[in-house]
C-alpha cells in the first residue's frame, strides 16, 4: 500500500484535546522501557524530545530519569498548551520545558545528551527534516531513540489495527489513528532514509504489530 500523507500539524483544538486525553500508556511506557533496555548506561543529562506533542512521553521519561532535564519541541500550539498543563500537573516544571519549533528549523536549543522522538516522522512532509534535527540536536555519541507507526500492507489491515487498538475510542481519535497508519513509513523506507542521512549505523527494529524503532548513537 502506498503512503497517504496527512496534515503535518495538529492545529485543531478538539483533535488535540482528544489526543491528549487518550490512553497511550502502553506504547508510551514501552518507549521508555525500550530506551532503558537499549541504553542501560544512561543515567541523566540534557534530553530533547522532537515532536513532543502533549508531552506524555516527555513526562514519563522525566519520571524514569530523575537526573535528566528535558526540552520538548513541537510545531502545534494546541498540543504544546496541553503539554504545558500536563507538565505543571506532574510537578515537573523545573525539569521539563516545552518550546514551539517546527522542523526543519534553523535553530535547535543546544546540544543534548540524548535525543528521543515518538510518532513525529509520519507527520513530516519531508522525512529528512527529522534525521537532520537528530544530527544537530545530539552531542557526539548521544543515545538516539525514535519510534513511530508502521504502515500496514493494506487499508483492511489498517482497519483491523484500529479495531484491535482503538476499540471504544472516540470516532475522532479512531479516524486519526487510521489516517496516521496510512501516513506511516515501512521499515525498509526508514532504512533508506537513514542511509541517505548518514545514519546507516543506526538499527531499525519492528517492536509491535504497529511500531518500529530506530536506535543507536549520534
Feature-to-residue mapping (PLM):
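A short, conserved alpha-helix within the catalytic core of class I
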Residues: 124-134
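Class I SAM-dependent methyltransferase Rossmann-like catalytic core
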Residues: 13-27
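Short conserved loop adjoining the S-adenosyl-L-methionine
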Residues: 105-109
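Conserved alpha-helix/loop element of class I SAM-dependent methyltransferases that forms part
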Residues: 25-44
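A conserved beta-strand element that flanks and buttresses the S-adenosyl-L-methionine
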Residues: 116
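Class I SAM-dependent methyltransferase SAM/SAH-binding core
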Residues: 48, 56-104
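N-terminal, positively charged/glycine-rich alpha-helical extensions of SAM-dependent methyltransferases
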Residues: 1-17
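C-terminal alpha-helical "lid/dimerization" subdomain adjacent to the S-adenosyl-L-methionine
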Residues: 147-197, 203-205
